[in-house]
Structures are given as C-alpha cells and as structure tokens.
From Swiss-Prot:
NCBIfam families reported in the protein's UniProt record: ispG_gcpE (TIGR00612), PRK00366.1 (NF001540)
One Gene Ontology term from the biological process aspect of the record: terpenoid biosynthetic process
Top EC category: oxidoreductase
Keyword set, alphabetical order: 4Fe-4S, Iron, Iron-sulfur, Isoprene biosynthesis, Metal-binding, Oxidoreductase
Annotated spans, Disordered: 1-24
Cofactors required: [4Fe-4S] cluster
Cofactor binding, note field: Binds 1 [4Fe-4S] cluster.
Protein name (database record): 4-hydroxy-3-methylbut-2-en-1-yl diphosphate synthase (flavodoxin)
Top-rank lineage group of the source organism: Bacteria
Similarity-based family: Belongs to the IspG family.
Pfam families documented for this protein: GcpE
Biased composition (Polar residues): 1-10
Amino acid sequence: MRYMQDSSMPCQDASPPDVGAAPRRATRAVRVQWGGRTVTVGGNASVVVQSMTNTDTADAVATAIQVKELAQAGSEIVRITVNTPEAAREVATIREQLDRMGVEVPLVGDFHYNGHKLLTQFPECAQALSKYRINPGNMGGGKQRDDNFAQMIEVACRHDKPVRIGVNWGSLDHELMARKMDENSRRAQPWEAQAVIRDALVVSAISNARRAEELGLRSDAIVLSCKVSHVQDLIAVYRDLSARCDYPLHLGLTEAGMSSKGIVASTAALAVLLQEGIGDTIRISLTPEPGGDRTREVIVAQEILQTMGLRAFTPMVVACPGCGRTSSTFFQELADSIQSFLRRQMPLWRTRYPGVESMNVAVMGCVVNGPGESRHADIGISLPGTGEVPAAPVFIDGERTVTLKGDHIAEEFQAIVEDYVARRYGAGITH
C-alpha cells in the first residue's frame, strides 16, 4: 500500500514555488510619439493598453470626443479608422482638437485596401498620425500588393512613423494561403487545415516585416500582430510568432464578442500569453452593447494587467460574492460605490498621491472571511451578516481602528479611505 507524504513534514532543501509571470521576452523597443509624449512598446517597457474608436472618423468632433474619453479612461494609444478621403482629410483636424484639449495620446491610423492612396494623397493625415496599422492581406495581389505595401512603407519612412503589420485570419493573403496548402499536401503526414492557417499567419507577419526592413523601415519601428477569434488558436499563433522573431507583439482576440463572453474569451487568451512573458501591448476587442460605454474595453484591459500583477492603474476593491450569511445587498452596493469613488478620484490622486494605484481595499459581507480579508488589505471594512451585531469594524494596515454603526456607514467609510490615502500616499507632497 502506498501512503502519501504528510504535508506537515518539512521537506529538506525545498524552495517555495515560483510566483508571478515569466520574464518578458526580449523585444525591440518601438517608440510611438506625439508632442511631448512618448509611449514605448516593447523593450523593457510595461505592457501598453490600447483602444479603438467606433465613430465615423469623418466626424472630427465626435471622434475627438471619444478619443479623449478613451485616453482619460487610461488608453495609452488610440486607433482610428482611416477608410475614406473624407476620413483622411479630418485626421489632422482631430489631432488639432485633441492638442487644444491637452490630450497628447498618440493616434494610430487603421488602413485597409486604400491606405497607400490615402497616405499619399493626404500628407497632413500621414503626419498627424503617430503610427500606421497595415494589413498586408487586403492590399491586392501579386505585384499590385507589393507596390501598395511598398508605397505605405515609403510614407512611413518619410514621416518617421512606426508601423504595425497586423495580419488577420479573416483577410489572410490568398496566394500565401494557397502555397501553404499546396506545401502541406506534399507532407508525408499533412497538418490539419487549422494548423496550416496558423503557420500562414506567422509567416505572413514575419515575411512582411522583413520586406518592410528591406524597403528602409527601421527594425525598431515595427510591431506585429496575428489576430484570430478562437482562444486556443491565438495562444498557439503567438507562441510560434514569439519564438521566431524579436519584434514587439500586439495582443488581441479579434471579434471576441459582447459582454461577459468577450471579456472571458479575451482574458482567457491574453492571460496565458502574458503569464508566459509574451505580449507588449494589448487591446480588448469588445462588441459594445447598444448604448454601452466604449471605455469598457480600456477598463477590462487594465483589470487584466492589474489582477495579474503586471501593472497597477487604480486601487483594487476585494469583495465577497455574498451567500446565505449576508442579510442584504448593502455590502455589494458599498463595494460598487467605493470602486466608482476610487476611479473618480484617480485623475487627481494619480499626480497628488504617487503609489495609490497599488492600494487594496476590502469590502466584506460577514464575519466568516471579513476580518481576515480586511486585515490583508491596506484598508478594509467587515459588514455585519445575518444574526451578527449591527456593527462594521474598519481595519487599516492590518489593525482594527474603528467600528462604524448606523445609517451612514458608506459615507463614513469613504471619508476614512480618503483620509488614509492623504496620510499614507501624501507624505512629503507639497499641496
């Protein structure tokens, strides 16, 4: 009979298991610039959060307003569609409006089919953008494709702009795909069609990057992406891509979907890759619900990075899910109001109280885990559950400091949080 080793017995020479993501893969550093702002993608820089507008770019006012909203939510680079002469004509106006509002977020132009024409015909558009996104799969075929691609790279070189070569499995180069399928048919053991498509995506991205370098684009001005809409395919593609080049990589699950499905799918794919040290910038492609807030994709991207311990953007609220021990939804309402309060305060706190973005706040609903979780947080409150004394102890830096009672617990706790932030993170700051 076999017996399991007693887990309470100490192991000789045992070391604790590793915690944290793998070291980031070494990549070139690509600088995306506008005005006095430089966002570095790759190298030793933190993973960058991106987003994309869904306005008609020809409507300069609406687009500038949405870009500002995305930037204020925390998007460090914003991409806009440039698909028509009318849109291209308004790009410089959008940039001017943003500059007047003090929004220096870099803009990326998203080009498909006619980018070579638009960038050439509207040089003010080419200059106002900080980066171009090129999809080599929809630039025509044969010599026409090569000429169109070369024309866009020539514009990028002339204006000293970096480029993202973004391959998408929905618009993969037909000639490359046919060649790859033909090669596969001659294998002794042919791959499944899905594997051939994944390989073609990687080959397309890398070969076009090499071609761009041959045309004069600096190697530190190239970012790559290979977008697919299935989680396992995305993971496999980026593992392969990261092993075969040192260009910085833009991660994103294309057509992720709406609401929780899109959030779960994007998180499932990106978390695996980020944990393996793969990925230099991310964008969460959520299909917005009618009347939904476009900034949601920015918040989700930030939350993925923060919950993985890769970056800190705003204080995190820990809250229990509730159970039969909780007599009301008050703790849930308090957790939501505190999280909203923290986000509202961050534009001011970010500059006034450095480090506050790493603060942890606990809002718990009963005595089972409430005091313990509150002690682990920087500041926490344990609300009474069913049958418990109607009192809410507050813990600060692991110590019980005060007990709140009555009808104004939410307001009093919010004031305590604000005072704690000022005392802990405002030390030495001159106001």
